A protein has these predicted regions:
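Surface-exposed short loop/turn segments
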Residues: 19-37, 100-149, 163, 167
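Sec-dependent bacterial lipoprotein signal peptides
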Residues: 1-18
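Short secondary-structure boundary motifs at beta->alpha junctions and helix caps
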Residues: 72-80, 147-184, 190
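A structural "domain/chain start" motif
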Residues: 17-83, 115, 194-196
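Soluble periplasmic/extracytoplasmic beta-strand elements of cell-envelope proteins
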Residues: 47-52, 65, 118-123, 135-141, ...
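Juxtamembrane/interfacial segments around transmembrane helices
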Residues: 55, 142, 172-175
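Extracytoplasmic/secreted envelope proteins and their assembly/folding machinery
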Residues: 86, 90, 94, 98, ...
Length: 196
């Protein structure tokens, strides 16, 4: 007789634990677009394929990681990436470059076109801090698809200042990270514009 109320209590407590916390929201680094990208579609425009970004293995997952001190990382309990971070960086960078390089056909999809260029990105670090401060250190090579000799090499450290709060919300952290990718696209785009 007392077993049934005890079971019901257990189910009720389990339900509260499962559904009582904040819902986890999925984020992406690229911005949703209301219109088609303003990029070249003419066949005579050069192509630029953005290959999947290489980054440290501990970053390449779906956790939004926040740096605490020199050695500690915490996963956000309320947010996660909608795709692996390497793919998110690649998609956001390709989208930013397509806006910044209207004379190129920019794509993150693998292209069978033998002509054109390929952008290879290596992310050394991509740290976001509780206050929203973000630092991206990366190097890149732009190579002709027909060969491996780099046309352009570059590297840089890109930062977004703190959001002005002690503990930034997930939206602010993601926005700071997207801003640093936009800065990276500016740097890559300026070398491509000079070379075109």
């Amino acid at each position: 007789m007392w077993l049934r109320p005890l079971c019901l209590l257990g189910v009720a407590l389990t339900s509260c634990g499962c559904f009582g916390g904040p819902a986890s929201r999925a984020y992406v680094l690229s911005v949703a677009s209301d219109s088609a990208p303003a990029q070249a579609t003419a066949a005579n425009f050069p192509s630029l394929q953005v290959t999947t970004a290489a980054l440290p293995s501990f970053l390449d997952n779906s956790d939004i990681l926040v740096r605490h001190g020199p050695h500690a990382l915490d996963s956000s309990p309320t947010g996660h990436w909608g795709e692996r971070l390497s793919l998110g960086i690649t998609h956001a960078l390709a989208a930013d470059l397509s806006q910044k390089l209207p004379g190129y056909r920019v794509s993150s999809a693998r292209s069978e076109t033998p002509s054109g260029r390929r952008l290879q990105l290596e992310v050394d670090s991509f740290d976001v801090y509780p206050d929203g401060h973000c630092v991206l250190a990366a190097s890149w090579a732009i190579v002709q698809k027909s060969g491996d000799a780099p046309v352009t090499l570059g590297q840089g450290v890109f930062t977004t200042p703190a959001a002005g709060v002690n503990h930034a919300a997930d939206e602010e952290l993601v926005s700071a990270m997207a801003d640093t990718i936009s800065q990276l696209a500016d740097a890559i785009g300026s070398t491509m514009a000079d070379d075109h």
